[in-house]
Each structure stands twice: as structure tokens, then as C-alpha cells.
């Protein structure tokens, strides 16, 4: 299991300047909640799992997107990817992979989708495989180059309405 990380120590900011609502969301009882999930091993080391808002709850399982993305990046067809949760009436959410393909790989190939799904099933726990796979030219990113998963989720919601 993993949990949300938080901290309280000298030198930590005490507020988001000029943003009281954001401050209220992030600080509780003097602790700053990072929005990250991590787990601690037997030796006391902490391991990053992913962002709290990027944890997928599928059929009672909690799936960290970072782990699934790490597996997908090992597949030869994948240059870049983002994993998000997609609403599902039975499972709550399912794993969705948005993938930028490597040169010479063609999107729209059902066999490629099956191969990617099989690869994830064989590399990590089978319930973590992406039930939805979407191929895109590029992933939305911030100016600093971080993938904007929130934009992917918003785009998916727009498509489904």
C-alpha cells in the first residue's frame, strides 16, 4: 500500500502567495501535503508511486500511473506515453494509455494494441494493463515539458459528452 506524502520542517513555505484557496487545499494542521503518493520499504526507504490525482481506482485496485508508464516506455513502439484513468460503469475506472509511437510504427493497428496490452500484463500485475489505448502525434505539455494529464482527462471528458 501507499499513502499521500506530507511534511513539516523549517524552511518550508507556509502559503501560496496570493492564492488562499490553493493554500487551504495544500496545508492541514501545519503539514504540507505534496500531492504525491509513495510507499516505504522494510529498510525505511520511500519510493515514489505517482501523483495522488494520478492514482487509478479500478475494481478495488489502486494503480499508480507511474508504474504503468514505466513499463510502457520499455515497449519498442512507445516513444512517449501518459497513463490516466477513464470512467467505467463496472470497474469505476480503467487504465488508459495515450501513446506517441516510435517512427515506423503505425497507429490504428489492432495487433499493436493487443501486443502493448500483453506486454504490460506480462511485465507487471495483469490488472494494470491499459484497457484503452489511444495513439497521438504529441502529448500536451507545460512550458517546462511536463505532461499535462489533466488536459488529457479533460479532452477525454469532452469526447464523451
Positions of predicted regions on the chain:
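AMP-binding/adenylate-forming catalytic core of the ANL superfamily
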Residues: 4, 9-10, 14-15, 22, ...
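General small-molecule cofactor/ligand-binding pocket signal
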Residues: 133-136
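Acidic/polar alpha-helix N-cap and adjacent early helical turns
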Residues: 154-161
